[in-house]
């Protein structure tokens, strides 16, 4: 800064290389940082208020949040855990993405290639190759290849493979069968059967035990409980 109040960047010799001699430290009340040159590698020690700074560990895990990924060890690799206790139980699972408060917190221990994004998404679930998006989506879903998108979608589906629940409370009441596709708000909310295809808001709402059904449209077979 010169006397006239102007600011300049650089040195009196613009071709001078960046060296330790012309770096500096800025004190700024909330922290102390190196000036950033080049790729910013000198910007260090920025805390995130959690168990880790924003650096991957030796196994390639990237973790941020109090208690997130707290049980990971030498065979827990290439995971991304962000949020309070996200992925807290994982001790051997790989290539998972858990984002949000308590996302996949309790029982995901060894599953691989899962995605849980949202408050308590997949909190008590397990398995591999599953996708949970939304608050409490797939809350207790276990198995493989499941998809739950929407608040409480597939919330209590405790097992079964290749289930798809899309919509607020879609297929939320549970069951253990697989190969069911439910799309629509409250569609199949109480459905516990297997190999069903339910499309439309409230379609198959009370289909508690029926299998091999196809219901299409708003309120389709809403009162049906056990037909197959």
Predicted regions and their residues:
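Short, surface-exposed charged micro-motifs
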Residues: 17
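Glycine- and small/polar-enriched repetitive beta-structure motifs of secreted/surface proteins
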Residues: 4-6, 10, 46-228
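A signal for long, low-complexity, Ser/Thr/Asn-enriched, surface-exposed stalk/shaft
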Residues: 2-7, 20-50
């Amino acid at each position: 800064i010169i006397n006239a109040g102007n600011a300049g960047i650089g040195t009196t010799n613009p071709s001078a290389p960046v060296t330790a001699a012309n770096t500096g430290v800025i004190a700024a009340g909330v922290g102390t940082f190196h000036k950033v040159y080049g790729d910013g590698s000198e910007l260090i020690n920025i805390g995130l208020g959690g168990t880790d700074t924003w650096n991957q560990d030796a196994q390639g895990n990237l973790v941020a949040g109090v208690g997130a990924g707290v049980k990971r060890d030498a065979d827990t690799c290439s995971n991304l855990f962000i949020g309070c206790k996200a992925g807290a139980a994982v001790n051997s699972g790989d290539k998972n993405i858990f984002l949000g408060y308590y996302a996949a917190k309790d029982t995901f221990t060894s599953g691989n290639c899962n995605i849980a994004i949202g408050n308590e998404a997949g909190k008590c679930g397990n398995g591999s190759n599953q996708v949970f998006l939304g608050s409490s989506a797939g809350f207790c879903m276990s198995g493989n290849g499941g998809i739950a998108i929407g608040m409480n979608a597939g919330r209590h589906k405790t097992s079964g493979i290749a289930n798809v629940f899309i919509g607020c409370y879609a297929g939320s009441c549970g069951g253990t069968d697989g190969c069911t596709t439910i799309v629509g708000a409250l569609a199949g909310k109480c459905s516990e059967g297997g190999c069903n295809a339910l499309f439309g808001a409230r379609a198959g709402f009370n289909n508690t035990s029926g299998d091999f059904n196809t219901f299409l449209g708003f309120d389709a077979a809403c009162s049906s409980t056990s037909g197959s």
